[in-house]
């Protein structure tokens, strides 16, 4: 059996050109001043609190056997507010998930966006991931909204924009999202600021 040496193995795709990195850096530096990495507008403590809150809600949801078996629910927390997205077999299962989430310590508000229906498959999950990436990339190039100020989540072609924005910024972010191929609906879960 003949083997190839490591030096002859080629990558699956060519690495990005240096011009792409220059463009990426241009957007990051323009959007974030001197920073060399994106900065979440929430404090580090709030980010940790939100991560802990997501775990608490997910734990509460895992206690329900029907939800665990038949539903696909993702939990997103932002400043103590919880967004539930995914699919559940019945409307009562969706309401049950909302009630379980409300029982988690630290929840200030719940947005229940769980849809009634079959769980989505790996193909749709991949498409949703692509949509989220495309929107985030376009937000980096947008001068009206900083990409770090809005969290983008896609579930079954529905895009959820989460963050603390002015009405004009929220509208600009929604317009960016609407113009990405594969987006069926844009839902703003925004804390409005002036």
Swiss-Prot record:
Transmembrane segments: none annotated. Residues 1-19 form the signal peptide. InterPro entries: BON_dom, Lipoprotein_DolP, Transpt-assoc_nodulatn_dom_bac. It is found in: Periplasm. Residues 49-118, 127-194 form the BON domain. Keywords: Cytolysis, Hemolysis, Periplasm, Repeat, Signal. Its main location: periplasm. One of its GO terms (biological process) is killing of cells of another organism. It comes from the Bacteria. The keyword Signal applies. Pfam families: BON (PF04972). This is 21 kDa hemolysin. The gene is hly.
């Amino acid at each position: 059996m003949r083997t190839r040496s490591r030096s002859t193995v080629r990558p699956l795709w060519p690495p990005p050109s240096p011009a792409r990195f220059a463009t990426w850096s241009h957007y990051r530096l323009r959007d974030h001043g001197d920073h060399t990495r994106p900065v979440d507008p929430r404090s580090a403590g709030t980010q940790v609190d939100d991560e802990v809150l997501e775990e608490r809600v997910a734990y509460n949801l895992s206690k329900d056997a029907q939800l665990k078996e038949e539903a696909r629910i993702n939990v997103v927390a932002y400043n103590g507010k919880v967004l539930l997205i995914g699919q559940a077999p019945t409307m009562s299962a969706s309401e049950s998930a909302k009630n379980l989430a409300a029982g988690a310590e630290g929840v200030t508000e719940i947005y229940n966006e769980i849809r009634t229906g079959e769980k989505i498959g790996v193909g749709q999950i991949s498409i949703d991931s692509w949509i989220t990436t495309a929107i985030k990339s376009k937000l980096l190039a947008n001068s009206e909204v900083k990409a770090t100020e809005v969290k983008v989540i896609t579930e079954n072609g529905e895009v959820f924009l989460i963050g603390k924005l002015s009405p004009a910024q929220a509208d600009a972010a929604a317009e960016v999202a609407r113009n990405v191929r594969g987006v069926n609906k844009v839902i703003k879960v925004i804390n409005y600021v002036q």
